[in-house]
Each structure stands twice: as C-alpha cells, then as structure tokens.
C-alpha cells in the first residue's frame, strides 16, 4: 500500500504537460488510445437509453483534428495556443491526425476551436 500511496503522490505533483506526456507514453506502452474509450462509452450509452446520453452530448463536445492541411506550421501554432502543449507534443498531435485536440468542452468553445483550426488551414470536426 505504501507504494500505491507514493504513486498517487507522485502523480498529483505532475504538471499538465507532464501528465499529457505520461498519458502519451502509457498509450504507446500499452497499445491503447485515451480517445477511444470516450467514443465507445458514448456509443454504448446511446444503445442503452437514448434520452440521457442525448442530454450529455449536448453539454460536452470533443474537437477532433481530422487533417492538418498544407500549412502544418500554422496548425501546430494554433494547437499549442488552444491546448497549452509544448512544440513537440503539438507537432505529434497534428501529424497524428485524426486526434482529439480538446475534449469535454461546451458547444460554443468547441465551435470556436474548430473555427480557429480551420482558419489555420486544418480540417476539424466537433463530436
């Protein structure tokens, strides 16, 4: 139990950028994607009962970068501004499209992020 408490303490002290990097490393190590369970949960919930998941979908949206387009540098800059990621992390996200840029945001914020990405030359979807 002492080891688990130490792990919890260490994880609690991580910065947002360090947590994002840890997430990425764990995804690579375990061969999973953090974005996939969110989509699966939404689809699974919709099959269970249409009324409750429909309300949840209306309040939280994910902005997905589907294509970086020809002007990757501007898109990387915009992704950095939106997410607060470092240069390498933003570049990896853009080059790994389709990927979620921002998850669980309001409809207005999702539309704003999508517009910023499209203005930078990328293609994005709000889901």
UniProtKB/Swiss-Prot annotation:
Q: Name one GO biological process term.
A: translation
Supply the source organism's classification.
Answer: Bacteria, Pseudomonadati, Pseudomonadota, Alphaproteobacteria, Hyphomicrobiales
Subunit composition and interactions: Homodimer. Part of the ribosomal stalk of the 50S ribosomal subunit. Forms a multimeric L10(L12)X complex, where L10 forms an elongated spine to which 2 to 4 L12 dimers bind in a sequential fashion. Binds GTP-bound translation factors.
Has UniProt tagged this entry with the keyword Ribonucleoprotein?
yes
Q: Which family does it belong to?
A: Belongs to the bacterial ribosomal protein bL12 family.
Keywords carried by this UniProt record? Ribonucleoprotein, Ribosomal protein
Under the heading Pfam families, the entry gives:
Ribosomal_L12, Ribosomal_L12_N
Gene Ontology MF terms: mRNA binding; structural constituent of ribosome
Is Electron transport set as a keyword in this record? no
* HAMAP family in UniProt: Ribosomal_bL12
Q: What is this protein called?
A: Large ribosomal subunit protein bL12
Give coiled-coil spans as residue ranges. Answer: none
Output the PANTHER family linked to this UniProt entry.
39S RIBOSOMAL PROTEIN L12, LARGE RIBOSOMAL SUBUNIT PROTEIN BL12M
Gene Ontology annotations for the cellular component aspect, listed alphabetically: cytosolic large ribosomal subunit
Give the protein's biological function.
Forms part of the ribosomal stalk which helps the ribosome interact with GTP-bound translation factors. Is thus essential for accurate translation.
SUPFAM superfamilies under this entry? ClpS-like, Ribosomal protein L7/12, oligomerisation (N-terminal) domain
């Amino acid at each position: 139990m002492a080891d688990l408490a130490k792990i919890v303490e260490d994880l609690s002290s991580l910065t947002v950028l360090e947590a994002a990097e840890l997430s990425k490393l764990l995804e690579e190590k375990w061969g999973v994607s953090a974005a996939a369970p969110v989509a699966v949960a939404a689809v699974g919930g919709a099959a269970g009962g249409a009324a409750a998941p429909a309300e949840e979908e209306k309040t939280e949206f994910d902005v997905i970068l589907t294509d970086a387009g020809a002007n990757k540098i501007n898109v990387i800059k915009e992704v950095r501004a939106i997410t607060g990621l470092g240069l390498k992390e933003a570049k990896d996200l853009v080059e790994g499209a389709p990927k979620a840029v921002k998850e669980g945001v309001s409809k207005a914020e999702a539309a704003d992020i999508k517009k910023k990405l499209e203005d930078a030359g990328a293609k994005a979807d709000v889901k």
